[in-house]
Amino acid sequence: GDLEKKKSGSEYFGVGTVSTSYCDNFIAYSLDLKGSEYYTIYLRDLRTGKNEKDVIENTSGSVTWALDNKSFFYSKLDQYHRPRQIFKHVTGTSSDQDQLIFEEKDETFTCSIGITSDEKYFIISTSDHITTEEYFFPTDAKEIIPTLFKKRKNDVRYSIDSWRGYFYVHTNEGARDYKVLRCKTNQINKLEVFIPAKKETVIGGFEFLDDYILRSEKSDAIPKLFVR
């Protein structure tokens, strides 16, 4: 806020993200004080109102907390301002000790990390403008080994989410205006059609609400919402 801007002494003050730990005791926030869009991540203890010693430079600005409330994930920017590495940071330690958990080798792709709706898996997404590829690993994994969901294929985009034992896949593979597939989380090679492609209809994203799935479509320029 204004206090942080005043303390920084910088004419430029860009906020990347403010992310609260699951226990609500900490926030990780990122700032760009130069206008370079290279963000530095800071950690604050909300119980004391004071910042911890944790400082992580040259990041994309995004933060995804782990469920243990003691660590979080972030992406690091390379010299060309592309996020191509995902790291795990343990609070209270130096960023020099952060664990590299994923690196995108293709310089035309960039990567990010998020968590599924049921908080069972972390999802690493890597993409260029027309192609995506995603990896997953359990949020309670003792050893992080990202598993490839489906190998990248030129001009095919997909994104995955999980809910109640299933992965749901929103994809344009064989469906210009998208469709939704699903599979059991332990059988990722056995995909089945959940919402088929429809002529002249864009199949949008979806959200999970207990026993229901809220999803969107658009046809004749009219957006529609469905509850399933």
Regions found by a protein language model. Name each.
Residues G1-R228:
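Peripheral, non-catalytic segments that deliver or gate enzyme domains
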